[in-house]
Amino acid sequence: MKIIVKPFHEITTQELYNILQLRSEVFVVEQECIYQDIDGKDQKAIHIFFTENKKTIAYSRIFNEGEYFENPSIGRVVVAKSERGKELGKKVMIEGAKYIKENFTNKNIEISAQKYLKEFYTDLGYEFTGSEYLEDGIPHIRMIKDQSI
């Protein structure tokens, strides 16, 4: 497995195609959520993706503070259905947190988590803040991780 970390302008056309294909497979088709995944924010993001045999198997995108939330954030966390159960979601989140800690001044991470994944994120050190809300028809919660130490 290869771990790739790139800003948008360094992503190849094939890498972008594979990333968007994975996001669409999971967020639009599997979760039956019709929404505009290509939201105009990818250009500002740092993209972390895991590949195997030229296929993207896990992905997330990172934003610096003020680009998405008040704090740096990790979003669009996704793992290919065929690769689940291998802790790739955890690994891609850890890579994102590491990138933020090493490259951004503000070390805290703010995420908009699908509610059913609250325990997954809690196990990674995120704390629930605020109230539940709907995002694209799916219940979400705001969570923050303090990495300032």
Regions found by a protein language model. Give the residues of each.
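A conserved beta-turn-beta hairpin within the catalytic core of GNAT-like acetyltransferases
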Residues: 65-74, 84, 103-107, 137-139
